[in-house]
Amino acid sequence: MEIRVIGRGALAGLVAGILGFLFAWIFAEPTIDKAIDYESGRMNVLSTVHTAMGHPVEPDGPELFSRSIQSGIGAATGIIAFSVAMGALVAVAYLVLHGRFQVRPKVLGWTTAGFGFLGVYLLPFVKYPSNPPAVGHEFTMEARGFLYLGMVWGSLTLLGLAVFAARKLSAKVGWARAVGIAVLGFFVLYGGLLAALPSLGDLAANVEHAGEFGFARAATETPQPITNTFDTPVTVDGKVYAPGQLIY
């Protein structure tokens, strides 16, 4: 039985992964391409300005995988593999919880999947939405990754604690009151987690780079338009930009 249930979960994940890749390929990849073009052009302008001012400019690293591979087989492999793994994990969670709650198997299955959706995607998304569509500020990539994973871990932990509390309290106050208390406690702790973690645009690295040319603080990690913040005109590709004028 266990192998069959896990296999069904993995199969459901496979179907979801294929649909997810098709959606990404049709709707998301064009936006990502535009974002990459924007960031590449922005970096070229910054390199030109820094070179003209005599500042050292680091060369671009080698491209390990072409954009066509990234948006094609790379995205397909990543999305489908992740979806299969998530489907199998939901099936394992279902097997662990089966028999511990007096609910029908179908209800338990949908509830387990729903809690997984909340903990892995929706609740972390409230604090750290998926932005930017390309790379964003390179100096915050590592911090963003750790913060997002921390938000996922915190969300799943709080959901687990809420279920545990509701189950323990149900014997004393009944299921309805137990669920109400657990939900209220969850939102209080979840609100504390949202307040405790730093917001995008306010990370330590953002503050550190606040005075650099071409950087502007914003409530996002998408690089902002470049403005001439110097007291003198700046020449880029033969065009002169006055102080305060938008360059790119």
Where are these regions (language model features)?
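Juxtamembrane/disordered regions of integral membrane proteins
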Residues: 1-248
